[in-house]
Amino acid sequence: MNVSANGSVYDALTKAIATLGETGLQVAAYHLGELVVDTWAGVADPETGRAVDGDTLFTVFSMSKGVTATITHRLVERGILAYDEPLATWWPAFAAHGKGGITVRHALSHRAGLPGFKGLAFADQPSLAATGRNLEEATPDWAPGASMAYHGMTFGTLLGRTIELATGKPFAQVLHEEVTGPANIPDLWCGIPADPSIHARVATLHPGN
């Protein structure tokens, strides 16, 4: 641990809470495989005052895109997926409404033409199967590969549902087999496990400023 760097980052976190309206923050940084910063500040649950600590779990949202892409690349290496094959190769129902030409490469590069869900609220996304059904009924906003736009909400379903169907396994299981198990990352999940001791460590989400 780099004591000086750790202290500087801690000071930055407390300043962000004091001046930027942040509630709870946690930072870990590695250099050449060595943990050099591991610090935190603020509260994990504003209602109870539960403080953030080194074991607090945070929802990572779009950081999961990198994990999903990593799984995709690993499956391509083994011939389970292929960059230039249509998603419909493994997910036939996805081909409806002109989506048969959308490939794994298009999905990885945000060029699938499906940057958002239509008629699906954030709270109505219980599973990849459910969000996948929404995309099955969708019509692309442009031809595959013709343009690029950040697929902020749909990236995970485009690739995650394809991964499920190509492997015959739930995405959470594939995540463990391909990433978290081999890399010994015990606290990264797709969906929080039912264990109450894990739920007790999760930071409470609340509307931002």
Describe each model-derived feature in a short phrase.
Residues 83-97, 183:
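Short, glycine/proline-biased beta-turn/loop segments that scaffold the active-site neighborhood
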Residues 65:
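Short, conserved phosphate/pyrophosphate- and ester-handling motifs at nucleotide-, phospho-/glycolipid
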Residues 1-60, 80-82, 137:
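Short, conserved catalytic-motif segment at the N-terminal edge
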Residues 34, 45, 97-209:
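Short, surface-exposed loop or secondary-structure junction motifs
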Residues 60, 83-84, 91, 104, ...:
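Structural motif detector for alpha-helix initiation sites
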